[in-house]
Swiss-Prot record:
Protein's organism: Chlamydia trachomatis serovar D (strain ATCC VR-885 / DSM 19411 / UW-3/Cx)
Family: Belongs to the SIS family. GutQ/KpsF subfamily.
Pfam families for this protein: CBS (PF00571), SIS (PF01380)
Domain annotation CBS: ranges: 207-264, 273-328
Keywords: ATP-binding, CBS domain, Nucleotide-binding, Repeat
NCBIfam families in the record: kpsF (TIGR00393)
Residue ranges of domain SIS in the record: 37-179
GO MF annotation terms: ATP binding; isomerase activity
Name assigned to this protein: Uncharacterized protein CT_399
Residues annotated for ATP binding in this entry: 52-57
Keyword ATP-binding: yes
Top-level taxon in the UniProt lineage: Bacteria
Length: 328
């Protein structure tokens, strides 16, 4: 029978339990085994396989997908290993098997056949005295923590531990490989990740013909129609060669009015503008532009300069354009 309010109480109880077990994971997991395994993978020339049964198999698939996205030669071994799929495994390959208990029947049935290749076998388990651990050449021992369900049977906490380990291994390997954004982007050309990883500033800028310009001698009052009509919240202050001298924003206007009152309207822009503003090259990665906008004193617009001399303004990059493209 439904009792009003019980869902909230149970949810809160499980939430606190999640926080507790996550803390226990970080307190008890010996991560030195991860860097040791990473060293092994960095020197390895053959294929790398991961597998597991049930929910552990889902974690193995996710780890393989993550590694493949940055170019690692990693593959998933299906549960049909003994029905022909064993043929993809070659002598010297590394095979990593997930099993929380270390006693998963299907996994143990695979081991003699894998050993006959032979392969380097890595067991990933929460049971250091299990059969999987005993037969493995290298063992990753994950913390043995209580599951979240009332029976302590459903893979919840255990798969979270496996996932945390998987991400730690994958990201350590990625950093050691010195994978660049362009490397990653070449493997992920589609979707929102592809847009962010492969996009360049020149793909999203407003061209110079649409940029509001003023000379340094233009007064604040004279610049207001330009400032308001373009809707960017700024004007770029340039010389006759379109070299960027500074930027004047609606924020500069508000601060000037607060400090100097109406007298500011007679000031030339060169006296009130922001000199040496944040700028970005047209050939820069669009992700870099997001970092620049959000770092230090956050801004919503970046003047875009030429890639060669980085002095001549070629356009304007506004956060609204990035938002419309789905990059925020």
């Amino acid at each position: 029978m439904y009792v009003p309010g019980i869902a909230e109480n149970l949810c809160l109880d499980i939430f606190h339990k999640q926080k507790q077990v996550i803390s226990q994971y970080f307190a008890s997991f010996h991560y030195d085994c991860v860097h040791q395994l990473t060293e092994k993978l960095l020197c390895h020339q053959g294929s790398l396989f991961f597998s597991g049964i049930g929910k552990s198999g889902c974690i193995a698939r996710k780890l393989v997908a993550t590694m493949q996205s940055f170019g690692e030669k990693a593959f998933f071994l299906s549960g049909d290993l003994l029905h022909g799929d064993l043929g993809v495994v070659s002598p010297g390959d590394i095979v990593c098997l997930f099993s929380n208990s270390g006693e998963t029947r299907e996994i143990l049935e695979w081991i003699p056949h894998l050993k006959n290749r032979p392969v380097f076998l890595v067991g990933i388990t929460a049971a250091p005295c299990s059969s999987l651990a005993a037969f493995s050449d290298f063992v990753i021992v994950l913390p043995k923590l209580e599951e979240l369900d009332p029976f302590n049977l459903m893979p919840t906490t255990s798969t979270t531990c496996q996932l945390l380990f998987s991400d730690l291994l994958a990201m350590t390997l990625l950093r050691c490989r010195k994978i660049s954004l362009s490397d990653y982007g070449s493997n992920h050309p589609s979707g929102q990740i592809g847009l962010k990883a492969n996009g360049k500033v020149k793909d999203y800028l407003y061209p110079r013909t649409e940029v509001p310009f003023c000379s340094p001698l233009t007064t604040v009052a004279e610049s207001l129609p330009t400032l308001s009509s373009y809707g960017y919240g700024c004007v770029c202050v340039v010389n006759e060669l379109f070299e960027l001298l500074g930027i004047f924003t609606d924020g500069d206007l508000r601060r000037g009015l607060s400090e100097y009152g109406g007298d500011i309207l007679a000031y030339p822009l060169q006296q009130i503008m922001t000199r040496n503003p944040k700028v970005i090259s047209e050939d820069s990665d669009v992700l870099l532009s997001l970092e620049m906008m959000e770092s230090g004193n956050p801004v919503t617009v970046l003047p875009v300069v030429d890639a060669q001399q980085q002095r001549f303004i070629v356009g304007l990059l506004h956060m609204h354009a990035l938002a419309r493209a789905g990059l925020l």
